[in-house]
Structure formats: C-alpha cells, structure tokens
C-alpha cells in the first residue's frame, strides 16, 4: 500500500502542475519528484513516510483550492484532508504553521494589506481547528475507549520517567 501512496502522490503532483503550468511542466515536476533521493529511498519501504507525503500533498492542494475559491465545499475538503494528513504521521503537525504562513502570504499577495494577512491566518487556523475537531478528535477517542484514566496516568508517568530532559518532563502535573 505504501507504493500506492507514492504513485498517487506523483499523479497528484503531475495533475496539479499540469493544471497550472501545462503538460510539459507537469511531466518535469513528476520527473523531479520521482528522482528525488528521499522519494527513491522511502517509496519502497513500508513506513508512514509515503502516507504522510500523500496527506501533505493532498491537504495542501485542497487548502490552496480553498484559498482560491472560498466555498463551503472547499473549506470542508481542506479541513477533512488536513485531519487525515494529521493522522498519517506525528511530524505532519508541521502543516499547522505551514498553513498559517501560506494563508498570510496568500492574503498579502492578493490584497497587499495587514487585514488580508490576518484574515488569511484566521482562515488557516479555522481549517486546522475544524480538521482536528471532526477528524483527529474522533479517531483518537476511538483509541481511548476502554483505556482508563488511571492506566493513562500510569503509562504517562513511565514514559515521562524515561525522558532525558527533566526540564520538560517535570512540569507535567497529574
């Protein structure tokens, strides 16, 4: 299945680039994507990197589509794909500052004033919050069914006890 994520990611890159710049640019983007050393190394492995890549590309596509055409449908597609991307790998939390930054730049690039930049940031934050509430939250709640608060606390203490930097581990209060 991870190879499938690689193939679909390549198709998304080709299609998105072709839509904006034409077929030749789409083929060039696909060529560069396919021959990137990181992609070559990870596309054949069974880990979450390719799924995360797919989630990041898909959510970025729908987020940019929402910024271009701010309809309810595009908002929900951006929020849902963001939530799904967040579920693929922990490091995809970096989509949060990325989306806020893209929203700010988008607001400035098209309107050239602070109000539009703040509005772009607000829309980005709204996509993130809705994605967490409707996608990430329910999935994590399913994992917590039957996991008592006492067991959660005991497990957290064990994990925090092994954490090397006490500056961050000690302030956790139960």
Located regions from the model:
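Transmembrane-helix motifs of polytopic, lipid-linked glycan transferases
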Residues: 3-20, 58-62
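Perimembrane helix-loop-helix junctions
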Residues: 62-71, 82, 95-132
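Short acidic/glycine- and proline-prone juxtamembrane loop motifs at membrane-interface regions
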Residues: 44-51
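Membrane-helix interface segments
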Residues: 21-27, 70-77
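Specific aromatic-rich, kink-prone transmembrane helix
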Residues: 12, 51-68, 81-82
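Short helix- or helix-capping micro-motifs
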Residues: 29-34, 41, 61, 82, ...
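Aromatic-rich transmembrane-lumenal/periplasmic boundary elements in polytopic membrane proteins
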Residues: 136-174
């Amino acid at each position: 299945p991870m190879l499938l994520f690689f193939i679909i990611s390549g198709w998304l890159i080709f299609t998105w680039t072709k839509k904006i710049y034409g077929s030749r640019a789409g083929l060039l983007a696909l060529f560069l994507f396919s021959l990137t050393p990181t992609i070559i190394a990870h596309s054949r492995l069974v880990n979450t990197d390719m799924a995360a890549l797919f989630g990041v590309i898909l959510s970025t596509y729908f987020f940019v589509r929402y910024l271009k055409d701010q309809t309810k449908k595009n908002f929900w597609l951006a929020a849902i794909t963001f939530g799904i991307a967040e579920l693929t790998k922990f490091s995809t939390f970096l989509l949060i500052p990325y989306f806020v930054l893209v929203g700010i730049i988008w607001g400035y690039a098209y309107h050239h004033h602070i109000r539009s930049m703040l509005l772009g940031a607000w829309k980005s934050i709204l996509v993130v919050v809705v994605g967490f509430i409707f996608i990430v939250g329910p999935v994590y709640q399913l994992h917590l069914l039957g996991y008592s608060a006492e067991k959660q606390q005991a497990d957290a203490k064990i994990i925090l006890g092994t954490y090397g930097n006490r500056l961050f581990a000690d302030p956790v209060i139960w």
